[in-house]
Amino acid sequence: MSDYKKTLQLPETKFPMKANLTQREPEMLRKWEKDDAYGAMVRASGQQGTYVLHDGPPYANGNIHMGHALNKILKDIIVKSRNLQGFKAEYVPGWDCHGLPIELKVEHELGEKKRTMPAHAVRKRCRQYAEKYLDIQRKEFKRLGVFGAWDKPYVTMHPSYEAATARELGNFAAKGGLVRSKKPIYWCCSCQTALAEAEVEYHDHTSPSVHVRFPLRDPRVAEVLPGVDPAHAYIVIWTTTPWTLPDNMAVAVHPDFDYVVVRHGGDFHIVAEGLLEACLKAFKWDEHEVVARIGGRALEGLKATHPFYDRPSPIVLADYVTLESGTGCVHTAPGHGREDYETGLRYGLDIYSPLTDEGRYLDCVEFFAGMTIFEANPKVIEKLREVGNLLAEGRITHSYPHCWRCKKPVIFRATTQWFIAMERNDLRQKALDAIRDDVRWIPSWGQERIHNMIEFRPDWCISRQRMWGVPIVALLCEDCGEAWNDADWMRDIAERFAKHATGCDYWYETDLSDIVPAGLRCPKCGGDHWKKETDILDVWFDSGTSFAAVVEQREECGFPADLYLEGSDQHRGWFHSSLLASIGTRGVPPYRSVLTHGYVVDGDGRKMSKSVGNVVAPQEIIDKHGAEVLRLWVASVDYREDIRISEEILNRLVDAYRRIRNTCRYLLGNISDLTPETMVPFEAMDPLDRFALDLASRAHERIQDAYTEYEFHKVFHTLHNLCVTDLSAFYLDILKDRLYSSAADSHARRSAQTALYRILMLMVRDMAPVLSFTAEEVFGYVPAALRPDVISVFALPATDAPAFTLDTTSRAAWEKLLAVRSETTKAIEPLRKSGEVGHSLDTHVTLFADPSLKATLEGLGSDLRAMFIVSRLEVMNLADAPADAWTSEELPELRVAVRKAEGEKCERCWIISADLGTDAAHPTLCPRCTAVLTGTGA
């Protein structure tokens, strides 16, 4: 017996079957660094224009987590795909370096020393801390295979950036949008600073619940409510913040609600009629009598008395009073609530909030001086009980605002702060118009979400009582407290920040005399004693002005950005602050499109938590599976919802990755001896090869469309389906005989090889944005003669949609052929089950078809037998089908007869033939294989 295996054209490639990603990826990173693959990618693009994805800066604190990995990989997929499509899309990564988390870490490190250190010394430590984690995170992001200008990132603590932020504040001042006033804002007593809306999280919290009566001793009560004795009249409120009662200034009722006077014992109590039953249940009053009804508007102006202080609490009107809970009469403390504050302004009430920064009552607060608000809660209740004005007491668990940093409950506290006024220059309406008209929101529900947030938000409190940030450039009169912040002067100071080695440290290191303009006098009192404002800017203003510091300034960018991409929480964060900052100073939004992704959760859909023990770190996955699997995970799911991750999910993706890799390896192995000179033009290819290339080209078009629409899960599924279904299970299975058994330089083999090469190059381009390491590795193993002369797969020039496509008529014919192939497989199955044949190659198939189908089948010529992977195939008229021929339910125009093929199996190609041994030198070979070996045929 001869060894005919050596005569076959078997696959040959050095591309390794085993990915060994954890070892190979670092090698690839070094290659990319050495070759400047990112620069090569950018230099090769630009034919389609520019595309700007502006990076939302992660906070320079700690190692990266799965949310960071998801976000950066998504951005990398977009940047790479846009460049490969011909857009010059450069990626400038950024870091958010100012703010409370870093300052608190440094505070902890410094301990008591911080109290005696000058501000610039503390800021230096904060800067060093941020630099440390910036470098750590940069390495971790690069390990993910993310391309970008890593050596030239934007950093919010860089002098040029700080100057831009201060300059934008000056621009707001110039337009009258910057104001300073005393208003209630979110305040964290633990961190001792104001908080923005975006810095507040809502969690369940258990609070005291009290019903309190306010004596109504106003003589006019008898006129408004005949029969009610003012000496025994009360109006009842309900609150979950007893500590705010010392600051009560009024009781609010709704002008359009009906109220009732309820007699219990000898006292009269006013509550809303719609809440009467709930109140009676809370008070545990079995016996009572409703003695009067009155509209809320009629109660306005009556003077109640504070429940434990000798001062009036007038009854006022407010539309925000509801009948959802309580009594319909609302305790009003203008120093501790936005709505209370607005009511206080309307009625001229005192905006009273006698608290220290750490939440302790000042000495002027009778009964509770020196107590924290939480210490005061039980003491207030005790006082109410003592004076006889506590009607009911309990506990309630409700959603309550907490500090995003320390996770402790926050309060509303009226303090003097700096604000961006939402109604000045029509900022709110302009922002709402831009949301509706000028921005594409992906997913679309993002539009309504941010619209509602902007529509109902208060003025933006931008001041913080901390050190680590951009200072609010303003002077305060030491004589009267008035602020001075001339816009031109503010912008001049900003330019000094830009020139200073450490940016806005200039504010802290420079003598006051060098900052105050000569001869400046207070416009309010005429004084000339000034001090610097010590508040810093909200970090959301800091990052929100990145469009001015980066998008407008960096030559590789352009305003407005094409895309902002962050987690869905940024509708209240960076998307929000960036929109207001840009609309406020430019009149237009800073972005054309906004794309959001969900949160990473565990395999059961639970939020990741250290306490639960379900946190998965990116580095763990990289160490076990490689970054490539993490990238594939990002592309495999619809990231616009919350994204699950687990070992089971990753293992499935490892299998999917292996199938894609093995397909690439097979394609590489079968083109090792192909050259540009031996390639076959598309028009001259065998029909099956043209169809396969058409399938791959259509998949390529779908993949490119999916990249354009940010639907990366469609990229993955299309690529995976191409490898598994169209190639491995169909085309490559059919092709093996032609590739292995045909003469090396035959048209049949070169046609197939050309198709495989074209398909491989489409696949490499399509997979590169997602499977970056593997695409580069595959590209490196493409035979040198066939590989484009570029240093990286990412430097491939953009091409139009490939012309390797069939017309609709040809496609329809192939769809019919595939259907016939499927039906034929069904017809063979009974013989396989019975053991009569072991493989489809053991069969002789006769297809009986009507004239139309018969013509389609015969049009494939010699490829037809190969396509069905049988040893012999005939096509005959449907009318000639024997009675026992298999009948197709799907194709009535087709019947199939299957029998065991006659003859012997060719030792070289394994096809059964009745004509073995036509050449005495090769007695076990079929005529085709004999012709190949003797050089007389293909």
From Swiss-Prot:
InterPro entries, per database record: aa-tRNA-synth_I_CS, aa-tRNA-synth_Ia, Anticodon_Ile_BEm, Ile-tRNA-ligase, Ile-tRNA-ligase_type1, Ile-tRNA_ligase, M/V/L/I-tRNA-synth_anticd-bd, Rossmann-like_a/b/a_fold
Q: What class of enzyme is it?
A: ligase
Entry GO terms, CC: cytosol
Tell me where the sequence motif 'HIGH' region sits in this chain.
58-68
How is the cofactor bound here?
Binds 1 zinc ion per subunit.
The places in or outside the cell where this protein is found are: Cytoplasm
Q: Where does ATP bind?
A: 610
Q: Which UniProt keywords apply?
A: Aminoacyl-tRNA synthetase, ATP-binding, Cytoplasm, Ligase, Metal-binding, Nucleotide-binding, Protein biosynthesis, Zinc
Reaction catalysis annotation: tRNA(Ile) + L-isoleucine + ATP = L-isoleucyl-tRNA(Ile) + AMP + diphosphate
Which is one GO molecular function term here?
isoleucine-tRNA ligase activity
Gene Ontology annotations of biological process type: isoleucyl-tRNA aminoacylation
Q: What is its EC number?
A: 6.1.1.5
Q: Where is this motif: 'KMSKS' region?
A: 607-611
Positions binding L-isoleucyl-5'-AMP in this chain are 566
Top-rank lineage group of the source organism:
Bacteria
The coenzyme or cofactor needed here is: Zn(2+)
Q: Which residues bind Zn(2+)?
A: 906, 909, 926, 929
What is this protein for, i.e. what is its function? Catalyzes the attachment of isoleucine to tRNA(Ile). As IleRS can inadvertently accommodate and process structurally similar amino acids such as valine, to avoid such errors it has two additional distinct tRNA(Ile)-dependent editing activities. One activity is designated as 'pretransfer' editing and involves the hydrolysis of activated Val-AMP. The other activity is designated 'posttransfer' editing and involves deacylation of mischarged Val-tRNA(Ile).
Q: Subunit details for this protein?
A: Monomer.
Protein family: Belongs to the class-I aminoacyl-tRNA synthetase family. IleS type 1 subfamily.
The record's domain comment reads: IleRS has two distinct active sites: one for aminoacylation and one for editing. The misactivated valine is translocated from the active site to the editing site, which sterically excludes the correctly activated isoleucine. The single editing site contains two valyl binding pockets, one specific for each substrate (Val-AMP or Val-tRNA(Ile)).
Looking up HAMAP family in the UniProt record yields: Ile_tRNA_synth_type1
Name of the protein in its database record: Isoleucine--tRNA ligase
Q: Which lineage do the record's taxonomy fields give for this organism?
A: Bacteria, Pseudomonadati, Thermodesulfobacteriota, Desulfovibrionia, Desulfovibrionales
Q: Which gene encodes it?
A: ileS
